[in-house]
């Protein structure tokens, strides 16, 4: 049975958070990027943004002492929370003791066998959403690991450093746009839902955070001949942001006359000027470029 808690008993209330940490003698580890959210209004906004209800299973990453988990468990069919810090497992058993729809998995999400784990949901056929306050130091590896996995995650609503959220959701011809924008938006739509100030965390991080909502596309944004080559071309085009596309391409592929002839032919096929910078190219442009370079033998 799921028990709905009263507002003043919320885990995220600062006094409750402090009492829990003191009771268990918990100290923060910088290596785990631990910052616990202490604002119940923001937690409710996260759940609302993710549109969590009884027809959804949730995977949470880094539950901490269970502040967000509590809100998720009240709304979702089931929550599977991955926590790498084994010191937090007994704390979560304490703070979430009233819920029978929460599984705490003491594993690194990057090493977990997710295909096996999701079968542990009581109803594994329900749509799965990822909702999490991601550690700043490992946000991108976790996101790309989950996005590129074969798990049919429906959407992600995740908190991360504001700068990273801006980069992921960026459009061409903006300072934030780059290979990360392309890597994520190829698979998913991405939009910043709202900003979270640094002042609502314990301990307070050095920067503000953002809630990013990403919804998986029915199919990738574009069709390309070779996905690995497409991502490789997009990455190398931003190695030196102030350099032209031509300079970045020749720095990677080489500057022999044969290579330069192939690059010129590929750029012409894609109808892209060598003097342009990578930040001016759309994902569709990069798709055309990658296919053209592949066609000329690069």
Curated annotation (Swiss-Prot):
SUPFAM superfamilies: S-adenosyl-L-methionine-dependent methyltransferases
Entry's EC annotation: 2.1.1.182
Binding site for S-adenosyl-L-methionine: 35, 37, 62, 83, 108, 133
Transcription among keywords: no
Main location, first listed in the record: cytoplasm
Alphabetic keyword roster: Cytoplasm, Methyltransferase, RNA-binding, rRNA processing, S-adenosyl-L-methionine, Transferase
GO function term, MF aspect, one: RNA binding
Annotated compartments: Cytoplasm
GO cellular component terms, semicolon-separated: cytosol
Name of this chain's protein: Ribosomal RNA small subunit methyltransferase A
Organism: Streptococcus pyogenes serotype M4 (strain MGAS10750)
